[in-house]
Amino acid sequence: MGQKVNPIGLRIGITRGWDSIWFSQSDYKKNLHEDIKIRKFVQNRFNNAGVVKVVIERFPEKINVNLHTAKPGIVIGQKGANIEAVKKILKTMTDKPVNLNIIEVKKPETVAQCIAESIALQIEQRQPFRRVMKQELRRAMRGGVEGIKILISGRLNGADMARRENYKEGRIPLHTLRAKIDLGFKEAKTTFGQIGVKVWTYSGDFIQSKEESEEDKYAVKRRTS
């Protein structure tokens, strides 16, 4: 099961929170489609800015969009010009004022999405894919991750038949729910077609605080008594 399913979706509520923070009974469908449009627009607009995650918070009178990015300077633009332009477009899409909050990713060399985008960009620049994968592998391990796996698939080096290659270092415990597993995906567009890049990173286990563990024990006792 852990080998097939998306590791982020499997661990929501355990090691990772939701990317859409709101509740609605009547407008659920409308809000869901708006969230999808907002994410697509932001990711297309800042395609090369290392956008890792887009968290959307909804309030009765406004919407907060928290943009986690490895390159905040590209997103902000000169004197905040990009932010103001994006705010206007999002306001017309949602009919509500939108606050755009930029959150910088501190160590992009350990974030799966940033690694995948870096590999895809270098493949598009005709760099040898094996060398690129090994470099990113070593950089991530030096950055502090406990395990990393990189998989690329497609017409590698322009071969007639598509194939896949992967490199792995450390361990990736996909079946352990408390493990902090991150997944990144990016497509490299080459003259021979698209090459898919997937990256899994493992950065330790989620450890509960003493208060949370005591609450869990108390809940178990109440159920069994």
UniProtKB/Swiss-Prot annotation:
Keywords: Ribonucleoprotein, Ribosomal protein, RNA-binding, rRNA-binding. Binds the lower part of the 30S subunit head. Binds mRNA in the 70S ribosome, positioning it for translation. The keyword RNA-binding applies. The keyword Signal does not apply. Residues 38-106 form the KH type-2 domain. GO terms for cellular component: cytosolic small ribosomal subunit. Pfam families: KH_2 (PF07650), Ribosomal_S3_C (PF00189). Part of the 30S ribosomal subunit. Forms a tight complex with proteins S10 and S14. CDD domains: KH-II_30S_S3. This is Small ribosomal subunit protein uS3. One of its GO terms (molecular function) is mRNA binding. Belongs to the universal ribosomal protein uS3 family. One of its GO terms (biological process) is translation. HAMAP family: Ribosomal_uS3_B (MF_01309_B). SUPFAM superfamilies: Prokaryotic type KH domain (KH-domain type II), Ribosomal protein S3 C-terminal domain. It comes from Leptospira interrogans serogroup Icterohaemorrhagiae serovar Lai (strain 56601).
